[in-house]
Curated annotation (Swiss-Prot):
Catalysed reaction, written as an equation: L-citrulline + L-aspartate + ATP = 2-(N(omega)-L-arginino)succinate + AMP + diphosphate + H(+)
Sequence positions that bind L-citrulline: Y87, N123, R127, S175, E260, Y272
Protein name stated in the entry: Argininosuccinate synthase
Pathway: Amino-acid biosynthesis; L-arginine biosynthesis; L-arginine from L-ornithine and carbamoyl phosphate: step 2/3
Keyword Cell membrane set for record: no
Keywords: Amino-acid biosynthesis, Arginine biosynthesis, ATP-binding, Cytoplasm, Ligase, Nucleotide-binding
GO cellular component: cytoplasm
Length: 400
């Protein structure tokens, strides 16, 4: 038996076409691997059967929902990861997990080639191929969409000519990627920056402009940086994301219309929905404001940004990311407590905080009676703090 091709299969246009195309052009057997990341929508058995219908000799579905939440989304929560201060890495977080399971499938099913359906314009080609090179440098990589310059029109035409079962049409050409952490929509009329998204773009969130009858108040509890409760009820990380997706999504929270800087050098417009992710990152960030010492918090904000950039750039398996996570793990020792948030009209508002690890001292902070702050020490502090600036200013004035 010749070496098999192990394909990262989403059930969408490009990877459905890829199964048939690889078989026709290379003569090799294709094993399709679909990863359940909590994306919802179609039943995964339907996706698996579609891969078989498209020509795969085997189709494997891996339930990786808890793994994704605990080993990929949780580090993003603890690093308050927002690329360009906005994008919660919806797609970027899932790619290294898919890579891991594709490598496992290659070992199990006799695959010498791994394949993906990424274009040459996107970030995912980098995330997949750098991941393969890191975990399994012996495997060859096939990227038919990129290497043979497929366009969406060509892919649709190929699918129609070969009776490939897909739902995409030329009139509805959105490219959609989704998982429990969020949903990403691109292409079509969204490529024109002035075009406003239409209702059919969204799925995880309700229209935030609707006059909702009442806000939703939610309390998120953390232990050492891990979300462990919603309104006092124990939850796993996956359950926390799922429950907040539903509650925040119902309030229109988590819609993002972003023009982002891609790794390949171009700018791209993306529409994201990440209700649960945005609530958890907001709550975790607020709890860190309460529990982290000032200089540690300042420095961690720098590492948070770098961690997000590394993940976005496909460097999940890099030594720097690993080192940053060791630092982040140390910072989470005291990040325990509860944050109360109000979800309403597309907005998240924090209105309560409590923690046994809090560095907020009421007696030091209050301006009422009982104030224990020694204000007599402030005059000397101000003088010493500004000494270098005053000396420099004195020199500059003397030189005029």
């Amino acid at each position: 038996m010749s070496e098999r091709v192990i394909l990262a299969y989403s059930g969408g246009l490009d990877t459905s076409v890829a199964i048939s195309w690889i078989g026709k052009e290379t003569g090799k057997e294709v094993v399709a691997v679909a990863i359940d990341l909590g994306q919802g929508g179609e039943d995964m058995e339907v996706v698996r059967q579609r891969a078989i219908d498209c020509g795969a000799v085997e189709a494997v579905v891996v339930d990786a929902r808890d793994e994704f939440a605990e080993q990929y989304c949780l580090p993003a929560i603890q690093s308050n990861a927002l690329y360009m201060d906005r994008y919660p890495l919806v797609s970027a977080l899932s790619r290294p997990l898919i890579v891991k399971h594709l490598v496992d499938a290659a070992r199990e099913h006799g695959g010498g080639i791994v394949a993906h359906g990424c274009t040459g314009k996107g970030n995912d080609q980098v995330r997949f191929e750098v991941g393969f090179a890191s975990l399994a440098p012996d495997l060859k990589v096939l990227a038919p969409v990129r290497d043979y310059a497929w366009t969406r029109e060509k892919a649709i035409a190929f699918a129609e000519e070969n009776a490939i079962p897909i739902n995409v049409t030329k009139r509805s050409p959105f490219s959609i990627d989704q998982n429990v952490w969020g949903r990403a929509v691109e292409t079509g009329f969204l490529e024109h920056l002035w075009n406003a998204p239409t209702k059919d773009v969204y799925d995880y969130t309700e229209d935030p402009t609707v006059n909702w009858s009442s806000p939703d108040e939610v309390v998120v509890g953390f232990e050492k940086g891990v979300p462990v409760s919603i309104d006092g009820n124990p939850v796993t990380v996956l359950q926390a994301i799922e429950q907040l997706n539903e509650r925040a999504g119902a309030q229109g929270v988590g819609r993002l219309d972003v023009v982002e800087d891609r790794l390949v050098g171009i700018k791209s417009r993306e529409i994201y929905e990440a209700p649960g992710a945005m609530v958890l990152i907001t709550a975790h960030t607020e709890l860190e404001h309460v529990t982290l010492e000032r200089e540690l918090g300042r420095y961690k904000r720098l590492t948070d940004q770098k961690w997000g950039e590394l993940v976005y750039d496909g460097l999940w398996f890099s030594p720097l990311k690993s080192a940053l996570e060791s630092f982040v793990a140390n910072t989470q020792e005291h990040v325990s407590g509860e944050i109360r948030l109000v979800l309403h009209g597309g907005h998240i508002a924090v209105n309560g905080r409590r923690s046994s690890e809090s560095l907020y001292d009421f007696n030091l902070a209050t301006y009422d009676e009982g104030d224990t702050f020694d204000q007599s020490s402030a005059k000397g502090f101000v003088h010493v703090h500004g000494l270098s600036s005053s000396l420099s200013a004195r020199r500059d004035l003397a030189g005029k």
